[in-house]
């Protein structure tokens, strides 16, 4: 498998075409961004750590029947994935109140949200990723009712698995972001990445952040935090879920 044309440069990844028209080459970079890209820095080993965490979790979710775009990880910063037409939506799941949800609704931080909340955001840096409700999604033809039904069902299954997975290693999954796409045969798959860049994680013993909030809020070096998450996931495998 060889990469060819650079198709897209994102905040933390570069995506290339390959000599297989149905397969993409995803390169994880060391760039960290926050505040809609206003804050940027190069973080040592971040690409390797996010690739490793994403690979581990994609493999586990695939093993429990979640359709994903994952195919292979040939080196420390590369992921080979199925080519998917991405839905222009960020799916946010909130298990506990945190971030702007706290200020928006004037609730206590870490209040448990039962049932978990699904939110949808239109994926557009230019527009600041605005919130979308289901009526807006359908009216603008960003996803079909059947696709969104599948998204909700898959997201609930993924959330249940990940909450248990992280709880088993002493981490609370506060909230997280997912992205989905469709393969050329129409199959809806989980795509993008699964890492502390997209998860809000809190240590159950200390209350410390174990995610990109450390960078966003200038709480210290980010690399050791991501190393800790990976180490715990590797130490206790999926059998503990």
Swiss-Prot record:
Protein name: Phosphoribosylaminoimidazole-succinocarboxamide synthase
Database matches in Pfam families: SAICAR_synt
Family matches, as PANTHER family: MULTIFUNCTIONAL PROTEIN ADE2, SI:DKEY-6E2.2
SUPFAM superfamilies assigned to the protein according to its UniProt record, in alphabetical order: SAICAR synthase-like (SSF56104)
Top EC class, one word: ligase
One example GO MF annotation: ATP binding
Gene Ontology biological process terms in this record: 'de novo' IMP biosynthetic process; cobalamin biosynthetic process
UniProt EC number: 6.3.2.6
CDD domains cross-referenced by the UniProt entry: SAICAR_synt_PurC
Catalytic reactions of this protein: 5-amino-1-(5-phospho-D-ribosyl)imidazole-4-carboxylate + L-aspartate + ATP = (2S)-2-[5-amino-1-(5-phospho-beta-D-ribosyl)imidazole-4-carboxamido]succinate + ADP + phosphate + 2 H(+)
Annotated keywords: ATP-binding, Ligase, Nucleotide-binding, Purine biosynthesis
Pathways involved: Purine metabolism; IMP biosynthesis via de novo pathway; 5-amino-1-(5-phospho-D-ribosyl)imidazole-4-carboxamide from 5-amino-1-(5-phospho-D-ribosyl)imidazole-4-carboxylate: step 1/2
Protein family according to the UniProt entry: Belongs to the SAICAR synthetase family.
Transport among keywords: no
Highest taxon of source: Bacteria
